[in-house]
Amino acid sequence: GKGGDFLYRWGNPSAYDRGSNSSQRLDSQHGVNWIKEGYPGEGNLILFNNNYGNLTSAVFEISPPLNSDSTNYIINETEPFGPNELEWMHTGDFHSNVQSGAFRLSNGNTLISVADDATIFEVDSLGSTVWNYEYPGANIMIARSQKYSIDFFGGSDSTAFPDYIIGDVNFDSSNDVFDLIYVVDMHYGFYPKTL
């Protein structure tokens, strides 16, 4: 049918003849994803709602209603897709007309990317910003970003890069000024040099 193999139409019931314009909750949403198992809110959907209000965006978390064995979404034949209420929402002084995204982190915080502003920030469950990054360049967008744990590239617990030292960007088995030079060169578009 219309929309592919999986279709969950929450947020604008007038688009499928089950509501009016006044019941619209989403406008130009992006980056819908399931919250990973083991993370706070696991199994819920989280998304970036580009046009939440006048020049305002928002991140929504919803918990779609499930049947008794928690394997299928409950979809009434005549009513709008549930839920009626948000599980969690964050909005504030950010807006993007395009792209953008949000991902729940294992500690319960949410990483938000605002494409038009080339900004990435992390908020806790109460909506307080705990980390913020604004790309300093012009004419740049950050569509979506993800945060990796400090041990992502390996260390003693990994077979991928067992001898990798966190921060050793040039792989010379040492954290030193050469790693910094390497990062600066990459940032400004110079080709990496052999040091």
Where are these regions (language model features)?
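Histidine-/acidic-rich catalytic cores in large beta-rich domains
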Residues: G1-A160
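Boundary/junction segments of secreted and surface-exposed precursor proteins
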Residues: S158-S174
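Alpha-helical segments with a strong preference for the paired helices of cellulosomal dockerin domains
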Residues: V169-L195
